[in-house]
Each structure stands twice: as C-alpha cells, then as structure tokens.
Amino acid sequence: MEKNKHCFYVVECSDGSYYAGYTNHIEKRIGTHNSGRGAKYTRARLPVVLKYVEFHEDKRTAMQAEYYFKQLNRKQKEEYMQKGERYVATKKLSTK
C-alpha cells in the first residue's frame, strides 16, 4: 500500500457495519482502529477489517469521496466497493 497518500477507506466492523474514513497512512490508521484508539464508532465494534481503499492526489478529493460514500445506502455502498468505483470530483466551471 502507498504511504503518505491521501486515501478514503472503508472498514467492516465485527458487527458487520461499515465505517468510512480518511487518512494519509492506511496501515497505521487500521492499526489505530484495532488498538481501540481509533474512532469512537469502531472502538465498540472491534476488530475491523479493511474492505476498500481509494488513493487520491489531495486531501480534499479523498474527503469528498468519503462524504459521497456516506450518503449511499448499504446496497449502494456494497456495489461501489465491488465495482471498484472511484469518486471523481466534478469541478464547477467559472462563468466569468
């Protein structure tokens, strides 16, 4: 896995739920989750397993991908991960 790249990731918790997040060091972040020092949501649902990761050139795009994913229902989330879809930010064109 790539280090120090901005990424959006999804882990599956022990109860079967998904947790999506952003990091720039995926291995360290998964370790933090599994040590109980990660997000409050995952602390009560250990262990977590990495299910999906997307690398982005910048933090903004990775966080937009995370936000987009969180708006989907479970079926759509599973389809997104299975297809290996990649979030592509749409840029607004200036009319000036």
UniProtKB/Swiss-Prot annotation:
It comes from the Bacteria. Transmembrane segments: none annotated. CDD domains: GIY-YIG_UPF0213 (cd10456). Residues 4-79 form the GIY-YIG domain. InterPro entries: GIY-YIG_endonuc (IPR000305), GIY-YIG_endonuc_sf (IPR035901), UPF0213_domain (IPR050190). It comes from Bacillus anthracis. Belongs to the UPF0213 family. This is UPF0213 protein BA_0032/GBAA_0032/BAS0034.
